[in-house]
């Protein structure tokens, strides 16, 4: 449990596009009194910290530093964004061997100085690397969280909201499973302000059929690839997603977010990290919710878990 105190320290490991933008989003949110940036490229890290610090007059008081792992000591949350970036045409799972090796050097250093921190993994493939972090750190599963499908779920809400011309925040739904190509949309539990989506569409004379679901799902699944093809990387939306998770932890909100967590017995799925609706609070993941899926969704979720397990088993550097 995050203890109530006058200061809140967040460390961000990796000062690339995602890490730096995450630090910026955290700074704007006002959730931390200290943000520490760590990266192998020390010059860039110093530059990012300087640039952010120059905006001190426009946000709540926050001390932004660049440093080494020792400077992260006593962090409440350590956000891990370090790793090789996803290239055009490259899947998240193809990043695995590069990033596992990077994590083997990062995680022991993080743990050395942060025995009580909550670790929030953002680097891709996030589900696999969350599991790797869980194993390398020796931390309880509650304190090793992946950003999971929080961003994918926002993308799904955005797609539905855009088509139905409603506020995406009024759409209740989840993307579950891998943050990647095998993720699933939980149409069977999707609703618009507690009205089932099929009933809402029928009542409002809106499209809701197999073609609608396929188009929306494909747009969500391929969203990152589309962004990468156009601008080379995704970082704004994921930074906001990370900030949302951090706020839930620091505020002990006990809110439900589809983060990546260790699944132990859900539709027969065990010993793998997946994006699942979880209660997130001051202890990290307080409970994973076993929502009822239809047979098709459950089958796809099992396949998603198998995809991730096979990737882990085939990783040459484990």
From Swiss-Prot:
Catalytic activity: (S)-lactate + NAD(+) = pyruvate + NADH + H(+)
Keywords: Cytoplasm, NAD, Oxidoreductase, Phosphoprotein
GO-annotated molecular function: L-lactate dehydrogenase activity
Residues the entry annotates as binding substrate: 86, 92, 124-127, 152-155, 234
Modified residue annotations for Phosphotyrosine: 225
Entry's Gene Ontology BP terms: glycolytic process; lactate metabolic process; pyruvate metabolic process
Domain of life where this protein originates: Bacteria
Pathway: Fermentation; pyruvate fermentation to lactate; (S)-lactate from pyruvate: step 1/1
Residues given in the record as NAD(+) binding sites: 18, 39, 44, 69, 83-84, 105, 122-124, 147
Any Pfam family hit: Ldh_1_N
Name recorded for this polypeptide: L-lactate dehydrogenase
């Amino acid at each position: 449990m995050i203890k109530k105190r006058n200061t809140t320290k967040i460390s961000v490991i990796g000062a690339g596009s995602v890490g730096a933008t995450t630090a910026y989003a955290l700074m704007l949110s006002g959730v931390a009194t200290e943000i520490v940036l760590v990266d192998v490229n020390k010059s860039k890290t110093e530059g990012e910290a300087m640039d952010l610090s120059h905006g001190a007059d426009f946000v709540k008081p926050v001390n932004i530093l660049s440093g080494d792992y020792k400077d992260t000591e006593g962090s409440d949350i350590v956000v891990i964004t370090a790793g090789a970036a996803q290239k055009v045409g490259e899947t998240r799972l193809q990043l695995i061997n590069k990033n596992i090796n990077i994590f083997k050097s990062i995680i022991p250093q993080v743990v050395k100085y942060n025995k009580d921190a909550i670790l929030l993994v953002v680097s891709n493939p996030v589900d696999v690397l969350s599991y790797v972090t869980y194993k390398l750190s020796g931390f309880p599963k509650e304190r090793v969280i992946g950003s999971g499908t929080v961003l994918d779920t926002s993308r799904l809400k955005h797609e539905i909201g855009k088509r139905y011309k409603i506020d995406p925040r009024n759409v209740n739904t989840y993307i579950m499973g891998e943050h990647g190509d095998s993720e699933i949309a939980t149409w069977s539990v999707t609703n618009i302000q507690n009205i089932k989506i099929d009933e809402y569409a029928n009542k409002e004379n809106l499209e809701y059929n197999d073609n609608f679901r396929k188009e929306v799902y494909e747009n969500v699944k391929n969203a990152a690839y589309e962004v990468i093809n156009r601008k080379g990387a995704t970082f704004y939306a994921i930074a906001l997603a990370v900030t949302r998770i951090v706020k839930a932890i620091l505020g002990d909100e006990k809110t439900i977010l589809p983060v990546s967590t260790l699944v132990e017995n859900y539709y027969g799925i065990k010993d793998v990290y997946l994006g699942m609706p979880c209660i997130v609070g001051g202890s990290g993941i307080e409970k994973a919710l076993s929502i009822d899926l239809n047979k098709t969704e459950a089958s796809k979720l099992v396949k998603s878990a198998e995809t991730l397990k096979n990737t882990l088993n085939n990783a040459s550097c484990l």
